[in-house]
Amino acid sequence: MRVLGLETSCDETGVALYDSERGLLADALFSQIDLHRVYGGVVPELASRDHVKRMLPLIRQVLDESGCTPADIDAIAYTAGPGLVGALLVGASCAQAVAFAWGVPAVGVHHMEGHLLAPMLEEQPPRFPFVALLVSGGHTQLVRVDGIGRYQLLGESVDDAAGEAFDKTAKLIGLGYPGGPEIARLAERGTPGRFVFPRPMTDRPGLDFSFSGLKTFTLNTWQRCVEAGDDSEQTRCDIALAFQTAVVETLLIKCRRALKQTGLKNLVIAGGVSANQALRSGLEKMLGEMKGQVFYARPRFCTDNGAMIAYAGCQRLLAGQHDGPAISVQPRWPMESLPAV
């Protein structure tokens, strides 16, 4: 089965073609970072308009690169949620229109299920069951995964997601958008131990997260430095390192708890923040000590992309699931509500 996947949940337009027998045939992505950078964050209306502009050229590009024609496509998969409602509607409308024109079924895919399954595109994919850490700009969740659609939520952020905290913190200390890569870049030049930030909610039982207080702690630290006349680049680097270390160690502590609680040995990390090298290194070291294994997608499939949507959609289509012709999206959509495959 060949499935064309469309991703438009936020500020990246992604298109990919996945073959259930041959794997990923082609993928293309257009990022709107430059469009939104001047505003310091994503402007939903601008995101929707740019998806309209980019979608059809990217579909043509993927078909050309794969050597396929519309007659070779068996189905369309698209992100139906969660995400920005306008952006989701662009993708859903396009998917349903193309599916109707080509005479093939369409299926809406949960954006975070796409992220969760992205490591399945690698040469050595994880096997069920495993614990998944979903960590992105909109979500920070620990999930027990026993199969596709068989998800048990173990813990989640009660306020800001980790990726959101990275972006907001970067803005507070005068860095550009997107903040995650900027903080990681500065952290490489930071002085270890100059600042020590708290590890939120690690001094109590449970697997929930909280990052809003850490963001405030960072702001107060920066303001004290500025008031003391120390707003140097090195101080920014030191604060960036302290913040990143606090987030990473908090995630490590919770992941260790989740693995011990479930008795599982394999961990999947997925979502945009899973590209962070400090997080990857920390998890690899921890899983090595626990005689377990950590799995993640290649960096370009950690952020939003069409390949993960094509793959996830293909699995559900092979199980006989598909949508009717109505255009429907869910900006808020609990992953645990998905049917099992």
Swiss-Prot record:
GO MF annotations in UniProt: iron ion binding; N(6)-L-threonylcarbamoyladenine synthase activity
Name of the gene encoding the protein in the UniProt record: tsaD
EC number per UniProt: 2.3.1.234
Location of this chain's protein in the cell: Cytoplasm
Chain sites annotated for binding Fe cation: H111, H115, D304
InterPro entries: ATPase_NBD, Gcp-like_dom, KAE1/TsaD, TsaD
Cofactor section: Fe(2+)
Gene Ontology CC: one annotated term: cytoplasm
Protein name (Swiss-Prot/TrEMBL): tRNA N6-adenosine threonylcarbamoyltransferase
